[in-house]
Each structure stands twice: as structure tokens, then as C-alpha cells.
């Protein structure tokens, strides 16, 4: 077991446009090679596209997409007597949001299309409507946990 103390969670600053912590977290996930201005431009363009296409507030749709994509349970590998079991565990709220944002960006990148902002906008709208690859990933995670319910007593 590690003797080091657990690192303190630093508070995340809200983004300048929407004054929202979640939007800033999304910008951080979209960012590559430290290019934050490019990442923020991509996210804000995606939000503008969502607003134009749906006619609703982009921030509400984004928050609904994150809420829909957040997993409640996941499986973790645990070795017991030479065998590795997939043990279902509840997901902490901060980890759930982190996974949801990670999946949104990951599946946006895999989408066919020209610009990242358009792909991100489409993925956000799909997730808000409970469709798309991100939601499929969450359902897959829940199914894995359900299938391995028998090993729940190995929880740690």
C-alpha cells in the first residue's frame, strides 16, 4: 500500500463565456498539445451550433448530455486466488462526470465529418437525446456491471 498522502483536488475554475465549471472541464479534455485557445474555440463553436440547431439554451443541452452520459456503475478487475473477476462498483460523482466528458470527446473524434466543432455538436445533441455512441458506451458499462453482479461481494 502506498505511504504517500492522497493529492488534494484543486478547484476547477469556470470558463469565461458561460461561467460554468463543466464547460471548462470539456475544454481541458478537447485540448491537445497545450493549445487551449484552439480547444476553447472548438467548444464555443460547437455550443453555438447546438444553440442554432435546437433553438434551446446550449448550456442546458450540454448539461443534459453530460447527465445522460454519466455512468452509475462500472466494473473493476480484482484478482482473487489466481482468477481475475470483473467486480461491479458504484461510480463516484466526480469520476462519473469525468468519464462522461472523456467519452463525449472520444466519440466526437471518431465521428465522420469535417470539423471537430461540428462533430462535438452532433455528439452533444445525440447524448442529450439519449442516442449516440456515448450513450451506447454508458449502456455497455451498465450491462457489464449487471452481468458481473455475482461478484459484487468482492467489492473493496
Swiss-Prot record:
GO term, biological process aspect, one: translation
Pfam family, one: Ribosomal_S7
Keywords: Ribonucleoprotein, Ribosomal protein, RNA-binding, rRNA-binding, tRNA-binding
A GO cellular component entry from the record: small ribosomal subunit
CDD domains documented for this protein: uS7_Chloroplast
Keyword Disulfide bond attached: no
Keyword Ribonucleoprotein recorded: yes
GO molecular function, one term: rRNA binding
Matches recorded under InterPro entries: Ribosomal_uS7, Ribosomal_uS7_bac/org-type, Ribosomal_uS7_CS, Ribosomal_uS7_dom, Ribosomal_uS7_dom_sf
Similarity annotation: Belongs to the universal ribosomal protein uS7 family.
Biological role stated in the UniProt entry: One of the primary rRNA binding proteins, it binds directly to 16S rRNA where it nucleates assembly of the head domain of the 30S subunit. Is located at the subunit interface close to the decoding center, probably blocks exit of the E-site tRNA.
HAMAP family (alphabetical): Ribosomal_uS7_B
Binding partners and assembly: Part of the 30S ribosomal subunit. Contacts proteins S9 and S11.
Protein name: Small ribosomal subunit protein uS7
